[in-house]
């Protein structure tokens, strides 16, 4: 029996579990029960879909027993079990990316960090918070071989063993007596696992009074079910309280915070299905990862099918957690069927409509609550405006933007309501931080005319805002595309000449130099041709790995009425330096880095010295 070493990342994880999360150690039981429930789900599915498993006779259950003398706690299930390879893969190693992500997310807050354990799929190891040693005895159905896995958190062994029935039995050799109290265990089970869909039996001590006068009674052990073991989503809404929903959410999400919102729907008619969705009050750890884990579980007639199907909801709703339970899908549904099945598509469309509708209700009835939601998930929601989403109009109603007038978040309907009668378009500015955008020279004319502009400072706004086109039949335009040509005086030959000379001095830096029709106070501003990507869009392309993009040069617009331009027309002896200063100042006002800071400082110093 050779001892095996844990992989480096597992040792790192175990140290964190034992030393960092100790104050919230009761969650070990939640995790082991959750794993047992998953094992029962898998066997239940096979017993309904695979001929060789249909002949099995067993009772799906989880059993927890105590031995106070030996200081052991044992969790057993009648689920799918594991073979030798699965023991090695499941308990000896962890996917490196998962461990790295887990460690990066640790905050030092024991309560928050303990939630991550289940979310990252490393819950089994939490048992080492309460146990010095763990023994796993397991056997798969249809197999004659059983195996044991033993570990003291330093190394582990796997060897053949004897086990009469299939399933898994986990024995913890406890460090202290806290979790040998059956009443303490019962409270933990009801707190975290009350709605696990399988019965959880707990060994409890029952006091039996003596039948003879003067004699003391004694304690007897009994095993009884302690959880409700019902599919909560199948219960009538009238029978459920808000706390029931909150408790169920915590069970399925491994999140100790109450959700912001729950949506419980039962549909009858051509297709029968039940959905129970939750919007979390904290961001899932993998919200902005490409390989995010789906938060929605699919059931067919209460039979668990999968929790790894991203097809159940569109990516822009990936923050949603919950259950979809459909009556008339085949039990052996495949990923291809999920993508193409008409019933599934109907349920998905109805679910999306319901979720967006409930969010709109919250937006209209509870602004504070909706603002919290939008701060958490607004960026993700806006991804639904990309491409040809059929829900684009509904999503657009839910989007909030900072107002250039108040700095507060407003929606497009509020913007339209405050528009002057002569204003025919909705204006926005994007491509930088909020403060930079708010102070951009591009807004000078809008501020002068008291026209509100939407400050779109999310990175994704640079991509999606040009794609929207209109809201409620009102065009949506970038401030760069606004036309104020009627408000400017005549452009003289001298103006055109100085613009051309500045262009000559900036020939490698700009596409063109033009007399601005939009500036009032600023010296200059950089804009881009309509089909050219601006600085923010170029940065996004690079983040996406498109490093070898052709160079795209901006257009420099100058303010002909600015004192510096007037003096430059009169005295062009320093036009080379001043041209570069104007360009660099325009870049800085857009929040961009200048190419050569030392050269800029030198030019400015020399010009100031001459002016003094």
Swiss-Prot record:
Pfam families linked to this entry: HATPase_c_3 (PF13589), HSP90 (PF00183)
Localization in the cell: Cytoplasm
Keywords attached to this entry: ATP-binding, Chaperone, Cytoplasm, Nucleotide-binding, Stress response
A molecular function (GO) term: ATP-dependent protein folding chaperone
Stretch list, region A: 1-335
Superkingdom assignment: Bacteria
Listed GO CC annotations: cytoplasm
Record's keyword annotation contains Cytoplasm: yes
Keyword DNA repair: no
C, as annotated region: 540-612
Location of the region described as B in the Swiss-Prot/TrEMBL record: 336-539
Main location as per UniProt: cytoplasm
Described purpose of this protein according to its UniProt entry: Molecular chaperone. Has ATPase activity.
Subunit text: Homodimer.
Family: Belongs to the heat shock protein 90 family.
Protein name as catalogued: Chaperone protein HtpG
Lineage: Bacteria, Pseudomonadati, Campylobacterota, Epsilonproteobacteria, Campylobacterales
